[in-house]
Amino acid sequence: MNTPEHSQLGKSSAYVDQYDASLLFPIPRAEKRAEIGVTGTPPFFGADMWTAFELSWLNMRGKPQVALAHITVPCESPNIVESKSFKLYLNSFNNTRFSDARDVRERIRADINAAVGAGVGVKTLGPELFDREPVHELDGLSLDRLDVECIHFTPAPELLFAEFDEPPVDETLTSNLLKSNCLVTGQPDWGSVQISYSGPQINQEGLLQYLVSFRNHNEFHEQCVERIFMDVWTRCRPLKLSVYARYTRRGGLDINPFRTSHPQALPANIRMARQ
């Protein structure tokens, strides 16, 4: 079984500029999910939405082409792709000739499908569409307005509680203070998070302190979002819950996981100012 420690993270890597799908390094989701009590079918839906900002290849005459790519990996997939391997894989397109962007798109789709064990979505955008890529902050009431004392810097779910004796509410809360660290290298990962729910009102001070408590925690983006979802779901017992995080890019890639308790359309993959 592939483990994060066997990946290229934190190691010197040769940059290959001829297409090589074997560079992709899948990691099973199951082990980290078991840590948060998720075995079998997960109690959530959603996807991991990737944006690739450094995609380039050669056309059939050797002229470089560039594009952005949006890749959507369903959370039902048994595997994720380790992000450095994804970067190295995309770099392998650099001196490889493809007939057109569709050929590139279909090649990426087939390779990521095989790596994660599920069907993924891939969309490419050429330079003529770059100015249509908007920038927008997460909608909702900012928790960051609260003046709270923070003393926990590893996940502290005991900070979460809700007003079970009060009428239920519908709320969307956001924070730009999410930070965790790469599971293998310990490098900082910076993110913003949006939590939407229906049910007993969640104490906002405790929720903000809980989100801050990820600050020294080592885990991949997808795993952090699932941990947040499960902690809020079990401790605050909402009727409905969605957790959406957008992380700043590294190596030309950003990862934006979304998890929800009920089937719904994915949020638009619109980058934030920090991305």
From Swiss-Prot:
GO terms for molecular function: preQ1 synthase activity. The keyword Cytoplasm applies. The active site is at residues 182, 189. One of its GO terms (biological process) is queuosine biosynthetic process. It is an enzyme of class 1 (oxidoreductase). It is found in: Cytoplasm. Its main location: cytoplasm. It comes from the Bacteria. The keyword NADP applies. Keywords: Cytoplasm, NADP, Oxidoreductase, Queuosine biosynthesis. Its EC number is 1.7.1.13. Substrate binds at residues 81-83, 221-222. NADPH binds at residues 83-84, 250-251. Catalyzes the NADPH-dependent reduction of 7-cyano-7-deazaguanine (preQ0) to 7-aminomethyl-7-deazaguanine (preQ1). NCBIfam families: QueF. This is NADPH-dependent 7-cyano-7-deazaguanine reductase. It comes from Polaromonas sp. (strain JS666 / ATCC BAA-500).
